[in-house]
């Protein structure tokens, strides 16, 4: 119980701006905040590298059971749509896990899209993430098309993808 309370306080701290004022909420239609963070190999990755492509940001942690369960759904969607340019970035909020441990964990789940690291929660703070899993769907133009808090099934993910995937015609 104390651990959960401490984690909640940490999330509160990460999601407040100067002098403890809450950050502005992220909303659909808004430009997605750019960020730079590292992958599990130490390479720096910026959201702007994916401008022009549909992007799914999934905030998760190895200790989050619903996050782990959702990974197979996200992998199935990625496999089905990666040839159409879909990018999924799994942003790990694990502060206590090493990059190697995060990589091993996501590999054990059968995930092939890249895990990124956000151990201090700075990327999560830009996106006002305070519950896991949370997923942001970003249109190729760089705007937020949809947001989902909590685990998703395949139908839910596919419903949100309609707003960001190129239309076949």
Protein language model annotation of sequence segments:
Residues 40, 50, 140:
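Short, ordered coil/turn segments that flank beta-strands lining enzyme active or ligand-binding pockets
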Residues 56-58, 90-92, 137:
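Hydrophobic beta-strand core positions in alpha/beta domains
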Residues 104-112, 117-168:
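Thiol/disulfide oxidoreductase modules built on the thioredoxin-like
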Residues 68-109, 119-126:
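Structural microenvironment flanking redox-active thiols in thiol-disulfide oxidoreductases
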Residues 51-53, 83, 111-112, 129:
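Active-site acidic short loop of glycosyltransferases
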Residues 45-68:
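Short active-site neighborhood of thiol/selenol oxidoreductases, capturing the structured segment around
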């Amino acid at each position: 119980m104390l651990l959960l309370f401490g984690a909640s306080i940490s999330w509160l701290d990460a999601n407040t701006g100067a002098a403890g004022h809450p950050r502005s909420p992220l909303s659909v239609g808004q430009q997605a905040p750019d960020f730079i963070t590292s992958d599990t190999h130490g390479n720096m990755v910026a959201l702007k590298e994916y401008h022009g492509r549909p992007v799914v940001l999934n905030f998760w942690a190895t200790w989050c059971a619903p996050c782990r369960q959702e990974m197979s759904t996200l992998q199935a969607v990625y496999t089905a749509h990666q040839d159409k340019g879909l990018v999924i970035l799994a942003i790990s909020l694990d502060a206590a896990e090493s990059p190697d441990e995060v990589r091993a964990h996501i590999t054990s789940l059968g995930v092939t899209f890249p895990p990124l690291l956000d151990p201090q929660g700075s990327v999560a703070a830009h996106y006002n993430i305070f519950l896991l899993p949370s997923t942001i769907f970003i249109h190729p133009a760089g705007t937020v098309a949809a947001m989902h808090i909590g685990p998703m099934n395949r139908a839910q993910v596919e419903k949100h993808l309609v707003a960001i995937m190129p239309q076949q015609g």
